Amino acid sequence: MKYDLIIIGSGSVGAAAGYYATRAGLKVLMTDAHMPPHQQGSHHGDTRLIRHAYGEGEKYVPLVLRAQALWDELSAHNEEPIFVRSGVVNLGPADSAFLANVARSAQQRQLNVERLDATALMTRWPEIRVPDNYIGLFEADSGFLRSELAITTWLRLAREAGCAQLFNCPVTRIHHDDNGVTIETGEGRYHASRALLSAGTWVKALAPELPVQPIRKVFAWFQADGRYSVKNRFPAFTGEMPNGDQYYGFPAENNELKIGKHNGGQLIQSQEERKPFAAVASDGAEAFPFLRNVLPGIGGCLHGAACTYDNSPDEDFIIDTLPGHENTLVITGLSGHGFKFAPVLGEIAADFALEKTPSFDLTPFRLSRFSQ
């Protein structure tokens, strides 16, 4: 049997692509080295932020707004909502370049973003402490996503629509010829007209020419109380420290508040190097500078987890065909800020398989930018 699309890596982007391509009427085979959702990549840990006024650059805003519409649609398929509109407050010095990008994106796209000075911030959320030179940009329409629930839902919907799924089965090689793409696995060879390579952190095992660096990252849950919950209207947040360190976190659930540090981490080259949480001496204390200064009412570390970022050299996404192979789309280099975009990236992959022109300007995400 020849498929229209083979998906190599069915985590966040791959799971979404499998659903949207199958829903469009294509014959699709989803593959993964593990059983998604799993803890070997970048999508585990219960929750991920979604922000609309994007501090990483205005080029992302059309993508994230389409993603939000698709998240709302996906949530309708579940009794438990996948998207929680908690709001997101972005904290940092008034002269922060990141916050300037947030404000610029909000102005250009007429997004619902409120600017709060330090006094107004601490009045609205007495649990937060910031210096006088800090501001907050509050996105009331943003919030957080239940990442593993999202992947489970996409996989179920794709399967119900007739998608073939081959999990716990690593792809060992990819072959290209005039007839399409062939993959080799322990279960045999499979053929398709087109392929999506969305293998996340370890994409270089199949495409070593891609400029992707795996980074070991950690996040942790700390003791909290009801003041920090969604019921008390406590928001999700990003926070920039005076030294430039970037943190992110979520409202407390079951008296546990999850927080992580976006920058830093350990460069790794193999799955074995991604040691579990607490294997590196700094893991448990990584969030202390932020908690001590900004959220002093939070208690001790309860537990944590390790994950991996697939960083591109400029930490912008890679969305392009594999060099020399126009029938294979690569989506990688999501650099720790990609999950919120998973549905729109999956939709882009489905359009690729349908040979449709993308609805977005993907020029900023082409591989050619690294050779200029």
Curated annotation (Swiss-Prot):
Q: Which residues bind FAD per the record? A: 4-34
Q: Which cofactor does it need?
A: FAD
- Assigned EC number: 1.5.3.-
What enzyme class is recorded for this protein? oxidoreductase
List the GO cellular component terms.
Answer: cytosol
Q: Taxonomically, which superkingdom?
A: Bacteria
InterPro entries in the cross-refs: FAD-dep_OxRdtase, FAD/NAD-bd_sf, Me_Trp_Oxase_MTOX, MTOX
Q: Which reaction does it catalyse?
A: N(alpha)-methyl-L-tryptophan + O2 + H2O = L-tryptophan + formaldehyde + H2O2
How does the cofactor bind to this protein, according to its record? Answer: Binds 1 FAD per subunit.
Oxidoreductase among keywords: yes
List modified residues, type S-8alpha-FAD cysteine: 307
* Keywords from the named record: FAD, Flavoprotein, Oxidoreductase
What are the GO MF terms of this UniProt record? flavin adenine dinucleotide binding; N-methyl-L-amino-acid oxidase activity; sarcosine oxidase activity
Q: What does this protein do?
A: Catalyzes the oxidative demethylation of N-methyl-L-tryptophan.
How it assembles, according to the record, is: Monomer.
Known NCBIfam families for this protein?
PRK11259.1 (NF008425)
The entry's family comment says: Belongs to the MSOX/MTOX family. MTOX subfamily.
Q: What is this protein called?
A: N-methyl-L-tryptophan oxidase
